């Protein structure tokens, strides 16, 4: 299967689909993205075992499709593979308790000022589960989130559902939202509290994005 990247912007009724026949370009570092255009797939930490990939193929197609599935949804896979993960024996509640205890210990000892606890859960898939259904269900369930589905042989298939609008605006100005969904959405005119500013200042974040446009207000 060829590499693809499909995304739905917050509160939109359409999705953007990109496919290419070539393998993704391997990028050595975030700095090497300077001047490049394309869709970036990057790990949290880049090293020899965690490469950055750029979808910038010459033999590529880009389409815009309605989310109602009325046309063109062959771009989104509607099949299952045979791969399955082993179900964990530890209950989600017990796993969370163990992880929280370890985190809390380091906070009490002032090893770190702030930690973000990320968890994973493995669920059995049924016969109705497919990348297409998962993407469309995510778009329906989270209308104000950025939803994306992408695949390359090098990275596997990933679904993204992000509540944050990292940057939004035009020539008149820009705005951003609290990271990690720490503020409830209450309209466009939101202001960060002193606590939110302090917490986000302690997060080491590097962002490299090739933007073809910014949404107009």
Predicted features and spans:
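SIR2/sirtuin-family catalytic core signature
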Residues: 127-170
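Cytosolic ligand/metal-binding cores
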Residues: 19, 36, 165-217
